């Protein structure tokens, strides 16, 4: 994806506020061989770009001052309750340096799996994105996971999926975490109906006959 940014001369709270009022979003681009540079972007164009998955997970082409450079989206600050992007950060990409990036997982074939078609399992996508390490040229926009072979009560782990060439999974704690699980549907247990012709309890029989249940017989007094 490609977007246009403009050089920003002024910084500070007041300058940023005036930018937002004029329909612009303040930002910064850093990293690589260049110095950190203040930028500004058209807010409406940025707002629509942020709705696209690729803007968050792929290498972007930023046009700035007549030159184009490759960058990654690194941070977005939103207003707490208004539809407003308050600030945005981009990082320059070095073609020879491995990078860490979260890549979306795209699942397919779930409805054709035995777990769903035959056993009516409930399939849970435990993970929706994967943090990976790779060179910029090897960064995938997304990783596709085929669930058509999923069996009942099965779990799928990171090691069960094939990562693109040059891409490695970055672990934080668990070396092989679960990404998908299939479990049987919950079945509510209903009370079993009374057997036909079964005799009702003594008290219930008396109530059904219109009378009151017989009182318990008093015990005889103990002899002195």
Swiss-Prot record:
UniProt cross-references to Gene3D superfamilies, sorted A to Z: Ribosomal protein L25, beta domain, Ribosomal Protein L25, Chain P
Gene Ontology BP term (one): translation
Keywords assigned: Ribonucleoprotein, Ribosomal protein, RNA-binding, rRNA-binding
InterPro entries, alphabetized: Rbsml_bL25/Gln-tRNA_synth_N, Ribosomal_bL25/Gln-tRNA_synth, Ribosomal_bL25_b-dom, Ribosomal_bL25_C, Ribosomal_bL25_long, Ribosomal_L25_dom, Ribosomal_uL5_bac-type
Superkingdom, natural source: Bacteria
GO cellular component annotations of the record: cytosolic large ribosomal subunit
Subunit relationships: Part of the 50S ribosomal subunit; part of the 5S rRNA/L5/L18/L25 subcomplex. Contacts the 5S rRNA. Binds to the 5S rRNA independently of L5 and L18.
Task performed by this protein: This is one of the proteins that binds to the 5S RNA in the ribosome where it forms part of the central protuberance.
Family the entry assigns: Belongs to the bacterial ribosomal protein bL25 family. CTC subfamily.
UniProt-listed HAMAP family: Ribosomal_bL25_CTC
The protein's name: Large ribosomal subunit protein bL25
Source organism: Variovorax paradoxus (strain S110)
